[in-house]
Amino acid sequence: KREKNMQSISIITNPTTENLVGRSHWWGAPDLPEDVPYPYVMVDDTQVVMGSTGMPKRDIHGNVIIEHGEDYPEPLTFICQIRMEDVAPFDKEGLLPRKGMLYFFAAIDYFLGDSSPIEIPLHGPVGDMVRVIYVEDVPDDVQPYDLHWEDTGESIFRPAEEITFYEGVESSETHALLSIPYQDEVSDSYPRHIALLQVEEDDRWGLHFFDCGSLYLLIRPEDLKARRFDNLQCEVFTY
């Protein structure tokens, strides 16, 4: 576990009309280079056939009838992108890269009040439901990723918010990078981990982790230094 009294990096977000391309921002569209694909999860479209009574249909042998559809890709929700140069002055331990961009994606639509066939695990390894992408050299001409819903033609992305970083305390109750969960139940369950990203509830976004809670994407400091962003644990803590 990291040394005590080390500071996290707190994140404050605010709505803005400014152009945030190439900058740190929350929500909005990620500025992914052309050779970096947007992360999707393949969904098995197998469904139980329902009858008019609301009960599953069954064949003559009493077996529930299953309808097999085609697998389809479901995009992960883009949470934020962090420009490494913005946070370098606050990263006293040198855990994060010093240049480039870090992009966070996760299947959190359910917690935003939307329906989705995919959802982050409440505890344990993130599997395919979280992707953290690090790009060391971001091209100067990078553009926001363009992705729309097929049925409406509307962008899948929420309005972008600008980010202000400042030195936080070790256990922060704000969105944060490099924090230690302030709930003992979480920090005790992951004694060798820190929160690469900590996400708190926000009524403005309709973001709620059940009655009241927090989302942690946890990583061991040695994995962070080795840039092993695939070796993450997820913890959705709720009171």
Residue ranges of predicted features:
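Short, Lys/Arg-enriched N-terminal segments with co-localized hydrophobic residues
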Residues: 1-5
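Preference for intrinsically disordered or flexible, low-complexity segments
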Residues: 6-239
